[in-house]
């Protein structure tokens, strides 16, 4: 953190409390810098791999949803995406509340249950996070489970029927 001398002098003299995650904690700051160094190595190869895995999963989910004629929109940011069942459209951005018309939380919840039956545990609500620990093999396994889950959804009129 830095700024004008007169402001920084107030902080240095303990006249102003400066809360934060790392103020005055050199070891923590060193850890942050080391982490950033790792993440930016090789022209940010870690991030590129995360994005490749995410792309594979998102594209695969859209393809599977079309195979079973299940309406699905995926909204995304780097490292995270949402599956919005009940809204047709594939991968796209949504800008207004009106674009959420048709979203069906029950389909999302039932999809999640079928995914769990097939060994993939998702966060509640349809949000997916992809990180550096995920591999292309993980993406393939996820899509195989998603195919089974969407098939079951379609066969059971979007309801969950336990095995």
Where are these regions (language model features)?
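Conserved N-terminal phosphate-binding loop of PLP-dependent enzymes in the Aspartate aminotransferase
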Residues: 1-163
């Amino acid at each position: 953190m830095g700024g004008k001398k007169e402001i920084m002098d107030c902080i240095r003299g303990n006249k102003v409390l400066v809360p934060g995650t790392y103020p005055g904690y050199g070891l923590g700051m060193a850890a942050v810098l080391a982490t950033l160094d790792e993440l930016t190595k090789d022209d940010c190869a870690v991030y590129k791999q995360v994005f490749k895995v995410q792309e594979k999963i998102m594209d695969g989910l859209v393809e599977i949803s079309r195979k079973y004629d299940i309406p699905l929109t995926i909204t995304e940011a780097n490292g995270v995406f949402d599956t919005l069942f009940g809204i047709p459209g594939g991968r796209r951005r949504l800008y207004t509340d009106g674009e959420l018309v048709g979203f069906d939380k029950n389909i999302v919840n039932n999809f999640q249950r079928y995914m769990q039956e097939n060994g993939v545990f998702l966060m509640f609500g349809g949000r997916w996070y992809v990180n550096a620990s995920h591999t292309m093999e993980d993406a393939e396994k996820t899509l195989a489970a998603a195919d089974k889950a969407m098939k079951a959804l379609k066969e059971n009129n979007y309801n969950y029927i336990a095995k």
